[in-house]
Regions:
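Loop/turn-rich, solvent-exposed surfaces of beta-rich toroidal or solenoidal domains
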Residues: 167, 179-185
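Blade-level signature of beta-propeller repeat domains, shared across WD40, Kelch, NHL, RCC1
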Residues: 226-253
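Short loop/turn segments immediately following the C-termini of beta-strands
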Residues: 36, 78-79, 120-121, 181, ...
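Residue-level detector of Asp-centered blade-edge/turn motifs that repeat once per structural unit
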Residues: 25-28, 67-70, 109-112, 170-173, ...
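Short loop/turn segments immediately following beta-strands, especially the blade-tip
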Residues: 189-197, 249-253
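A short loop-to-beta-strand structural motif that recurs across blades of beta-propeller domains
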Residues: 5, 39-43, 81-85, 123-127, ...
């Protein structure tokens, strides 16, 4: 087995951290993290130098920061019910979510520039199309139970359910990984042949719907307790919030 070392790369000093949430790397390798309780974004260089990211816009409980392939920054501005896009030149675009019951917890941007958004209270996955139109990808809008939990059918998400989510991330081949915080599962959403996620296929890949625990092993019998953030690289990494653990999901070959 591999051995790992843990070290602190950024800590309070010239800046103050208070409930740092999710972050992302820009194209030059600088890390930006949503500093939720202080309503700002912290910039962390590769040397560990921290500063408050300066912008003309203001935030209210920012939850997540991510970047697209062109270097544009996206911020989940939860309590303002908006996603903010900030270009390298400082231009800010506001993607409004005020029509929904809850603001954004997490985001992921695909290769076409569509912004996928997870929330804690709509019980749906949302998407801003390239023209800025807000759409529902799937979810009935009702909090699921173990009895009503459903992935829907292949290329038919009309009956698919979704709990709260704090983590979505794209993996290889534009498959979207989703943590279902309410139902303690990890799911994937694969688009149809035309790249349409609203007609895609949803699949639970890990966890037992509605069952809390911290059992490792075969993914569909393993258990989580409120899985939050997800990161996809060579493995799938899960922040298992209430178990206070970092978990990995690997594919058996």
């Amino acid at each position: 087995d591999q051995e790992y070392n843990v070290s602190t790369v950024a800590k309070s000093g010239t800046v103050t951290f208070n409930a740092p949430w999710q972050g992302g790397f820009d194209l030059s390798g600088i890390y930006y993290v949503a500093n939720k309780a202080l309503n700002n974004i912290i910039k962390i260089t590769q040397e560990g130098t921290c500063s408050v990211f300066s912008t003309e816009t203001t935030f209210k409980s920012p939850m997540s920061v991510t970047f697209d392939s062109n270097g544009n920054m996206y911020i989940a501005d939860r309590d303002n019910k908006a996603v903010k896009k900030i270009t390298s030149g400082g231009t800010v675009t506001n993607y409004d979510m005020s029509s929904l019951k809850a603001g954004p917890n997490c985001m992921a941007v695909d290769k076409k520039g569509r912004i996928f958004v997870g929330t804690g209270g709509t019980y749906q996955l949302h998407m801003f199309d390239t023209d800025g139109t807000l759409k529902t990808v799937f979810g009935t809008g009702v909090v699921p139970t173990a009895a009503t939990y459903s992935d829907g059918e292949q290329n038919d998400l009309s009956k698919a359910t979704m709990g709260a989510t704090f983590g979505i991330a794209f993996g290889p081949d534009e498959v979207l990984y989703i943590t279902d915080y309410t139902m303690h599962t990890i799911r994937t959403l694969t688009p149809d042949a035309e790249g349409d996620y609203t007609k895609g296929t949803l699949k639970t890949i890990a966890g037992i719907p509605g069952t809390k625990g911290k059992i490792d092993g075969s993914a569909l019998t393993a258990t989580f307790n409120c899985p939050a953030s997800v990161l996809v690289s060579d493995k799938v990494y899960i922040a298992d919030e209430q178990n206070h653990l970092i978990r990995t999901i690997t594919v058996n070959k």
